[in-house]
């Protein structure tokens, strides 16, 4: 049952496995076993290029769901965010609409030059599947060019990991990934604990981070990094999902911090 599987994963780490379905209830166990063993796992696998949008688009402006009114549409745009899509969740886009942002969603291999041509007030690095080091083979070069523009940047999950790689850090596959909606995280800046939603199997390695990076959040389960920021620029990221729906919503303030960074940066001439 699920409890015995949980104990197995806890003791031995995440194993390979197959969940199979058959209408007649008959299975070729040897064939399923061979295919399971043959599967190479997520390491070195770039899945962002598989799930990214095939065509750049502008989000239709729907906000997060609210009782009585449902999904209301944002009618006023104060800022323009370009979201790099590594596998973006729609609720992230809805939150940006809540904060009066126009969002241009671009594919994960869109060049830095094309992104800058859109004249964004800020750059968002989305969540997504796969090994960040594999996605980083093309994403790091793009991101480093964007970092030099001194624009506000905000990353979530895979976006957080790619930001760490671009800034000189490294990532690794975890023995036990973080899955669930009740992970306690300590905000080291405000000295507060947040309950967060998480779904990741890779993590940023703290000892590889250069001095220009400050660790802002840590897991209270295993002390792994849950958030970072660049000390001299309006750039930060978190490993978990502040946009999680129906919750927890302890970390929605991160969207406001990104908005505040764009407000401050808007006073400077960028284009």
Q: PLM ranges: what are they?
A:
Residues 191-233, 240, 270-271:
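Catalytic beta-strand/loop cores that center a nucleophilic Ser/Cys/Thr
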Residues 2-118, 130, 147, 245-247, ...:
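RNA-binding accessory domains that recognize and position tRNA/RNA substrates
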Residues 128, 233, 243:
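Flexible loop residues that form catalytic
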Residues 122-206, 247-265:
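Cysteine-nucleophile active-site neighborhood
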């Amino acid at each position: 049952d699920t409890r015995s599987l949980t104990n197995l994963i806890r003791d031995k780490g995440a194993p390979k496995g197959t969940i199979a379905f058959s209408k007649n209830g008959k299975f070729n166990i040897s064939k399923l076993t061979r295919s399971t063993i043959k599967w190479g796992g997520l390491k070195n696998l770039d899945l962002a290029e598989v799930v990214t949008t095939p065509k750049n688009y502008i989000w239709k402006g729907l906000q997060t769901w609210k009782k009585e009114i449902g999904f209301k549409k944002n009618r006023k745009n104060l800022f323009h965010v370009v979201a790099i899509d590594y596998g973006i969740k729609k609720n992230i886009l809805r939150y940006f609409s809540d904060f009066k942002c126009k969002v241009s969603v671009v594919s994960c291999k869109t060049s830095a030059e094309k992104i800058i041509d859109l004249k964004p007030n800020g750059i968002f690095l989305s969540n997504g599947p796969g090994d960040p080091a594999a996605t980083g083979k093309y994403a790091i070069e793009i991101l480093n060019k964007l970092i030099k523009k001194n624009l506000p940047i905000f990353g979530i999950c895979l976006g957080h990991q790619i930001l760490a790689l671009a800034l000189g850090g490294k990532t690794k596959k975890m023995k036990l990934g973080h899955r669930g909606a009740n992970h306690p995280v300590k905000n080291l800046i405000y000295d507060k604990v947040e309950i967060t939603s998480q779904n990741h199997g890779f993590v940023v390695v703290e000892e590889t981070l250069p001095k220009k990076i400050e660790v802002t959040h840590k897991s209270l389960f295993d002390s792994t990094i849950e958030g970072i920021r660049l000390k001299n620029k309006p750039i930060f990221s978190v490993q978990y999902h502040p946009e999680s729906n129906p919750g927890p919503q302890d970390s929605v303030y991160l969207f406001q911090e990104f908005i505040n960074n764009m407000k401050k940066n808007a006073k400077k001439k960028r284009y």
